[in-house]
């Protein structure tokens, strides 16, 4: 009898222990779940406020990642464009990057597996290219744009004694879309020389030199890493050989050389700002890459008239100032998780409608809805505007706005301005106006379309309250 009681007691104890364990496991699971939910909520909050992932078609400074960062300079690369955030924009294979070099900084020789198009935001420097069996040395300064072909070995330096050298660049990877690498022939621990990946036998045969000598040259540890500082006399020596046309160039239309956007006449200007551009007709290397570069200097309180590009997707990087942009978009309704769910539902509805049209002829009708994409922008912001998407950029009341634009797919592209003196809507003939606006409203439409006497760069929406980041 005692044995039965003992056995029963042990069974109850084991059952109690099991129940307690299950309770702890449940609590732990809930804690993990709460933690993960909290992380997701924090992530959603960051996205709503322009953090990682940002809002659709807009990326802030926090979306950049430092590839190199020393006291002498930084090289930062924007995260890859997520397809769900730039729907309709053919830019997934491109990357945006920013290079900043301190006074008298020197950048170690390297090459990218990507074509590079850059714009000098600030300062001056010397850029040396080693390619096709020759050396080309260029003096570049603020306002210059230039193309560097993939695979060219490049080294550069900030030639100013007190100003930083800052460059904004667009990279077009040639191996893997959206992914590029930098290769250093000379290095140590950071950066590592790519020659360190080869066997000693191969290197000794290739250079006809003993391993010990090769290590001294190619794998020597250098202080400061990829970006170092150079004595003033060495910077002067580097500057002596550089030119605006590229020493050793052929002088042909295919010659690589810097082109000044701000040194040429703007293609449009008025009291509200200036617009500059460098096209493929002026730079053959841009045409080959199907790219174009533009610069917009918008006076404070002014705006670019609502417009779209017929073929090109615009990648706009804010250089200076602040303001906001708005865009009409059929793909998304703003930003955040709720909008993504709505987008998915809308996508499902559209698929059903399209299937219905295929099955039942013309009885189905596609719903056309355009949503407002809007975000505040400041120095370092990146905006993506797909082809045919009407959009505008507005400078704040307090300061002017400078924006450099890279146009992807620019060959045969046209800009269409929808408001102002050059709006195509003004060209509607009278019968069309009566059909479009209604007979009684045709005259009123004429008055509305003719009310704006200016074009392209216009007076902004003054006196309508502050712009909130919706």
Swiss-Prot record:
Domain Cupin type-1: 57-215, 259-445
Temperature dependence: Optimum temperature is 55 degrees Celsius.
Glycosylated residue positions: 297
UniProt note: pH dependence: Optimum pH is 4.0.
Biased composition (Basic and acidic residues): 36-52, 338-367
Co-factor(s): Zn(2+)
Protein name, entry field: Cupincin
